[in-house]
Regions:
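Positively charged, polar, low-complexity stretches
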Residues: 1-95
Length: 95
């Protein structure tokens, strides 16, 4: 689990990031989870946008994704989600 200071640092880093994954009307499918998993492996910290036609609540979506992919929730702002998972082989972000 992340401490509040670690989460604050990650929020600051995510502030300038663009969302690299968009979740639309199909919702969170296995294909989307695979994309998120690959992005987390490559980048550790990612931002996801839930489109307006997505039926999931952003907080529920973040909890579901984090549970499925063993990631840490960082932040929800509107329809944007920020999640973090430390790379086991090559950690890039020092928190």
């Amino acid at each position: 689990l992340l401490t509040s200071k670690q989460r604050a640092k990650l929020r600051g880093m995510a502030n300038t990031m663009n969302a690299i994954i968009r979740i639309g009307k199909e919702g969170i499918t296995e294909r989307v989870l695979k994309q998120i998993d690959e992005a987390l492996t490559a980048r550790e910290l990612i931002k996801i946008t839930l489109e307006k036609n997505c039926d999931k609540n952003p907080k529920e979506a973040m909890a579901y994704i984090c549970e499925k992919l063993n990631a840490e929730p960082v932040q929800v702002i509107g329809r944007k989600i920020v999640i973090y998972r430390m790379s086991e082989e090559n950690p890039r972000i020092q928190i």
